[in-house]
């Protein structure tokens, strides 16, 4: 009989987007409990060791973290298995680098470098708005932040811009047709496009139709949509490819063209 929480994670059972090879060991780092779900996060150790290649082993990552060099959303994190997730800002003071975790079109977290100015804020999706004790209204975001006394105009599914220094809302984007969004779940994960319309299905899942910059349309559930810009102007910088997914044939042609130009 299992008593208590699970403490291990086998490599084969780890999320695909961590891109860990099967043969280098049996286990994978199990993310600590935190603001993002196990299958939607990237542990700090995977980011530093496997993506940035700043360390060769888990031991080295621990030494980096214990020197308090790594900040996530402006807070020092010493836990190597801390679950960083979508929209989180990872700052390395020593090298003066800042990264934002956003998805590429293959549905993996891209190593996306950002400027110092952009590292001062993040976007959060509003998951829930409730009235707490003594009638205090508050909203809960996708990364488990609770913010009291929000603007009454802000509703569920809107996006709020948060100042990481103070934790306060500095701006917000309504969930509306014509606004730019990124897909954060499902088969279209990582695609960016403009919301064209929303189908309401009471008792089931609402469906949102999105059109990308190439004119391709696709549909996904409302829960998978994260608004990232007013009109077609994004509030964050996007990774290479700008969230436009190519077809298999287009991708092959592009690869051959680069091969010929370099060869």
UniProtKB/Swiss-Prot annotation:
Domain S4 RNA-binding residue range list: 42-104
GO biological process, one term: translation
Record key words, sorted: Ribonucleoprotein, Ribosomal protein, RNA-binding, rRNA-binding
InterPro entries assigned to the protein according to its UniProt record, in alphabetical order: KOW (IPR005824), Rib_uL2_dom2 (IPR014722), Ribosomal_eS4 (IPR000876), Ribosomal_eS4_C (IPR032277), Ribosomal_eS4_central_region (IPR013845), Ribosomal_eS4_central_sf (IPR038237), Ribosomal_eS4_KOW (IPR041982), Ribosomal_eS4_N (IPR013843)
Signal peptide interval: none
GO MF annotation list: RNA binding; rRNA binding; structural constituent of ribosome
Name of the gene encoding the protein in the UniProt record: RPS4Y1
Stated name of the protein: Small ribosomal subunit protein eS4, Y isoform 1
Family, per entry: Belongs to the eukaryotic ribosomal protein eS4 family.
Organism whose genome encodes this protein: Pan troglodytes (Chimpanzee)
Gene Ontology CC annotations of this record: cytosolic small ribosomal subunit
């Amino acid at each position: 009989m299992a008593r208590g929480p699970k403490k291990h994670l086998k490599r084969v059972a780890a999320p695909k987007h961590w891109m860990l090879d099967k043969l280098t060991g049996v286990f994978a780092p199990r993310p600590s409990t935190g603001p993002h779900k196990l299958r939607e996060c990237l542990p700090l150790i995977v980011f530093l060791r496997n993506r940035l290649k700043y360390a060769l082993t888990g031991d080295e990552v621990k030494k980096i973290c214990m020197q308090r060099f790594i900040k996530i959303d402006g807070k020092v994190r010493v836990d190597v298995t801390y679950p960083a997730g979508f929209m989180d800002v990872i700052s390395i003071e020593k090298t003066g680098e800042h990264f934002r975790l956003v998805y590429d079109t293959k549905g993996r977290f891209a190593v996306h470098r950002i400027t110092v100015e952009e590292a001062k804020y993040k976007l959060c999706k509003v998951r829930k708005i409730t009235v707490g004790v003594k009638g205090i209204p508050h909203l809960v975001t996708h990364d488990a932040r609770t913010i009291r006394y929000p603007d009454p105009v802000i509703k569920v599914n809107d996006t709020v811009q948060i100042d990481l220094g103070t934790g306060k809302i500095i701006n917000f984007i309504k969930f509306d047709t014509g606004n730019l969004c990124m897909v954060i779940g499902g088969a279209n994960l990582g695609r960016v496009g403009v919301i064209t319309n929303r189908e309401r299905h009471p008792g089931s899942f609402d469906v949102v139709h999105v059109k990308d910059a190439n004119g391709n349309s696709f549909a996904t559930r409302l829960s998978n949509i994260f608004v990232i810009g007013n009109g077609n102007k994004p509030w964050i910088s996007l990774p290479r490819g700008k969230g436009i997914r190519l077809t298999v044939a287009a991708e092959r042609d592009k690869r051959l063209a680069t091969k010929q130009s370099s060869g």
